[in-house]
Amino acid sequence: MTNKNNQALDDYMRAGALMRLYKTVGAELYTTVGKVVSTADRKKLLRALHGIDTVCSNAEDNMFRDHPYLSDQYTNVFYGTTESEPRSEVDKAVLVMAREAAEEITTPRHIPG
């Protein structure tokens, strides 16, 4: 649950963007790794991915509790992948944030020696 101070809507949007990125990678991971591991390990991976769906649902509940004025366009913040077609302007913004996050995460950083 969120803390006593409402989380900023931007925090929820960023979290949703990262969840989409995670789901995109997770689907690819399941497809690729699933070819080289046992059925038992594939099931473990699938359970982990389904656990993320529960986390997304809880985060969405928190977002609407913290921001009850939001329109139904915000129901897509935590759902979909980076490959999804945008379903609303809010969805489009989250997709842009997800792609920006992917760029940030995969860009090498200079680490001082």
Task: State where each predicted segment sits.
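Amphipathic alpha-helical binding modules
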Residues: 63-113
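Context-gated lysine
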Residues: 4, 23, 35, 43-44, ...
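N-terminal acidic leader/helix
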Residues: 2-32
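Alpha-helix initiation/capping motif
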Residues: 8, 39, 88-91
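Generic detector of intrinsically disordered, low-complexity, polar/charged segments
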Residues: 12-13, 23, 48, 77, ...
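Short, charge-rich amphipathic interface segments used for partner binding and complex assembly
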Residues: 35, 39-84
